[in-house]
Design a protein with these regions (language model features):
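Extended alpha-helical, oligomerization-prone segments that build pores/tubes and scaffolds
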Residues: 1-629
């Protein structure tokens, strides 16, 4: 724990808490909309935002009113999420140049990124973040260096000492407070506050400070009030946790006065940390925010995004109303409305039991017999309005009946169905682009954190081709490039089925054929991999092994003596060495590689000369070769 001057500490705590309260009050209207969105998604659809600044549930106008919920919002959001979940974490590091060392460094960085994505279970985090983003409009990732992760490298009085590793977490929009709600770009904010409720024991374990706990609303992050109003909505956003304390982390971006930025961490009335931004995670080795923002839809002039649910709430209310009025009309048709003369029957009995089948109805002699009023039929306008609202659901949400129910007409061609599916996917382009850019930024921050903290040699276990395990030792100096590119353009449009069809067409056209009109073994393996059938026995493939050996020799040129082996595949080695030769600028290395290539060509000539008589069925001395039994 860092010791701070008493007066200095009190001033910092007071300033941070005052700034936090101001930002929370400014953001309250947006937070109410998020709560309303969550209620409609969960089925609490008879709620509204009141003028007093709360979300409350309004009651029935009459006791007999139908108040059922026909939740189309949930199915629309779930359909969008199922499509967003098809996005993969396929990303690669682009080398600085075509130099073999840069290429190998980029490959190592790519393997590290993939390993970190697997260790942090990034696909699961993406699904969780997408759920928050679709309902509230925004979500955030936080990428930090966790000292309690990684392999054990020693021990101390407090326990095992670990080497540390990257940690990625999903941060709901309730926990992020920008200094200006009108700034749309996260990096343009002068400061960002991340406020989260921690248990007091967890605060003591992390920062070594004891703070006083209280009951805290984990979403609004204020002290929980006792009791709820009569019309309060029983939603999950009013969850109250006990023995908690709100930890406020205020990140200030670098300025001319403070080139390394500033971070202040406050819990209760205690200052836990005050100093420079801890992570070199920005471009050009600068310090920046450890956050990444993703959105559902862009909201102009606002830091947070907007959710598709906000557009669907009026339609959902209208749909619930039309369905309930329709069922009320059906109830009148089925049970009827009885007309009786005053005092002719026992009305109490009728109200209690109704007109049950076989009921003996006794009425006063001489009075008009009870009769059912004519209710007519259900107005056709009800049906028209219901169909119109359903079509508006499709228009506004961008999710068609094809995506939700597969209700495809028989006369539609496969091409037409494909166009409809492509149109549905196109309407998700804003969310998919934001998610892809979020993945890229998270991976960039992971690499930059490794470059900052991997000072000594570290070992990483990778999943190689065909699932085999590969081990690599590296340091920060081995991770030069953080220029990331996606392996696929877009998984929603560039699907596996589209790839397979394209590859099959290219094979038919002979694009993969060599000069002899056949497909090489290497191309066969690549084709099988693209088709999703796996890179069959690639780790055991002889050609691939020769190619890897030649690439390793390219790196070893100039460092150690590289000899030509009799078992080398000379054609493959010559091709790989020629690539290095054409890219090399050092004259001494050019001469060294040239001599090495000449040795391969010489041994290749000798091998070919030895094979010619064998192909004719003759021995070296000209005599016929007679096979023995």
């Amino acid at each position: 724990m860092t010791k701070f001057n008493g007066k200095f500490s009190e001033d910092i705590v007071k300033e941070v808490r005052k700034d936090f309260e101001r930002r929370r009050e400014e953001r309250k209207p947006l937070e109410l909309q998020w709560r309303l969105n969550m209620n409609f998604y969960n089925g609490n659809q008879y709620s509204e935002i009141t003028p007093v600044g709360d979300v409350e549930q309004y009651g029935k106008q009459y006791y007999w009113q139908e108040r059922e919920v026909y939740n189309h919002i949930a199915s629309i959001v779930e359909t969008r999420l199922s499509k967003l979940n098809r996005l993969k974490c396929g990303i690669s590091v682009r080398p600085f140049s075509n130099d073999d060392s840069d290429v190998q460094t980029a490959k190592l960085s790519t393997q590290i990124v993939k390993a970190l994505c697997e260790e942090n279970d990034l696909p699961k985090l993406l699904n969780e973040a997408s759920s928050w983003s679709e309902v509230t409009g925004s979500c955030f990732f936080k990428t930090v260096w966790a000292g309690e992760k990684g392999r054990v490298i020693g021990s101390s009085k407090k326990g095992a000492v670990r080497e540390g590793d990257v940690d990625i977490s999903v941060v709901p929009p309730y926990e992020i407070f920008p200094d200006n709600l009108g700034t749309s770009n996260l990096d343009d904010c002068m400061s960002i506050i991340h406020a989260k409720a921690y248990h007091v024991d967890e605060i003591k374990d992390i920062w070594g400070v004891e703070v006083q706990g209280e009951d805290v609303n984990v979403f609004s992050l204020d002290s929980a009030s006792v009791g709820m109003g009569y019309n309060s909505v029983p939603d999950t956003l009013n969850g109250v946790a006990h023995d908690m304390c709100v930890v406020i982390e205020k990140y200030s971006r670098p300025t001319g006065e403070k080139p390394n930025g500033e971070l202040s961490i406050v819990a209760g009335d205690k200052l836990l940390y005050h100093g420079d931004l801890p992570y070199i995670n920005a471009v050009n080795e600068g310090r920046g925010y450890p956050f990444t923002k993703i959105i559902c839809l862009e909201k102009l002039g606002c830091f947070y995004g907007t959710s598709i649910i906000e557009r669907l709430i009026p339609l959902q209310r209208a749909y619930n109303a039309i369905k309930n009025r329709k069922h009320e009309f059906i109830n009148r048709l089925s049970t009827g409305v009885l007309s009786i003369e005053d005092g002719s029957v026992d009305t109490d009995n009728l109200e209690d039991e109704g007109l049950s089948p076989g009921k003996v109805l006794i009425y006063r002699q001489g009075s008009t017999p009870p009769k059912l009023l004519e209710s007519g039929r259900i107005p056709v306008d009800f049906q028209y309005e219901e169909e119109r609202i359903m079509s508006e659901f499709t228009t506004i949400s961008g999710v068609s009946e094809l995506s939700k129910y597969s209700n495809v007409l028989n006369q539609m061609s496969g091409k037409a169905i494909g166009l409809l599916v492509e149109q549905d996917d196109t309407r998700l382009s804003i969310a998919t682009t934001s998610l892809r850019m979020g993945i890229k930024r998270v991976c960039e921050q992971m690499l930059r954190l490794y470059k900052q903290f991997c000072i000594t040699k570290r070992m990483k276990r990778f999943s190689g081709d065909n699932g085999e395990v590969e081990l690599a030792y590296f340091t920060a100096s081995d991770l030069q490039s953080d220029d990331l590119v996606f392996d696929n353009e877009n998984e929603l449009t560039d699907t596996l089925e589209n790839k397979r069809n394209m590859v099959v067409e290219l094979v038919r056209m002979g694009i993969f054929n060599d000069d002899k009109g056949a497909i090489s073994n290497r191309n066969k393996l690549k084709i099988l991999e693209i088709l999703g059938l796996g890179n069959w026995e690639s780790s055991k493939d002889v050609d691939e092994s020769h190619r890897k050996k030649a690439m390793k020799e390219n790196i070893d040129f100039g460092k150690e003596e590289v000899k030509v082996a009799e078992y080398d595949d000379h054609d493959l080695h010559i091709d790989e060495h020629l690539k290095r030769l054409l890219e090399e600028k050092n004259q001494s290395l050019i001469e060294l590689i040239d001599e090495h290539i000449k040795e391969h060509k010489m041994m290749k000539t000798v091998d070919m000369a030895a094979q010619i008589p064998n192909e004719r069925g003759e021995s070296q001395n000209g005599n016929a070769i007679i096979p023995t039994n």
